[in-house]
Amino acid sequence: MFGGKGGLGNLMKQAQQMQDKMQKMQEEIAQLEVTGESGAGLVKVTINGAHNCRRVEIDPSLLEDDKEMLEDLVAAAFNDAARRIEETQKEKMASVSAGMQLPPGFKMPF
């Protein structure tokens, strides 16, 4: 049923190795920082892997414009950063699960 002699033990060992790799990858992801931009780079927002905002950079030329436009640019830059961190997380986790034979559409618990 489990591939013969030692099959279940081997399966458990692989599961433990996978869990260790996933934990390490999650720790690495938490340390990641990405920067999202809007307004052709005039507004930049940097967030970490936990989606916490680390830094906001605003080009001085925007401080003379209206407040509403600046708020929109900051929101757009944050959304861009969030999209980028999600993509990076998916890529890193895909590398961890690459050796697993998962059914199509299976979602990992992270």
From Swiss-Prot:
Any Pfam family the entry gives: YbaB_DNA_bd
Q: Residue ranges of region Disordered?
A: 1-22
Keywords attached to this entry = Cytoplasm, DNA-binding
Keyword Cytoplasm set for record: yes
- Decide whether keyword Cytoplasm is in the record: yes
Where is this protein primarily located? cytoplasm
Which InterPro entries does its entry note?
YbaB-like_sf, YbaB/EbfC
GO CC entries: bacterial nucleoid; cytosol
Places the protein is found: Cytoplasm, Nucleoid
Q: Which GO terms describe its molecular function?
A: DNA binding
Give the family this protein belongs to, as stated in its UniProt record: Belongs to the YbaB/EbfC family.
Q: What does this protein do?
A: Binds to DNA and alters its conformation. May be involved in regulation of gene expression, nucleoid organization and DNA protection.
Subunit note = Homodimer.
Q: What is this protein called?
A: Nucleoid-associated protein KPK_4227
| Organism of derivation | Klebsiella pneumoniae (strain 342)
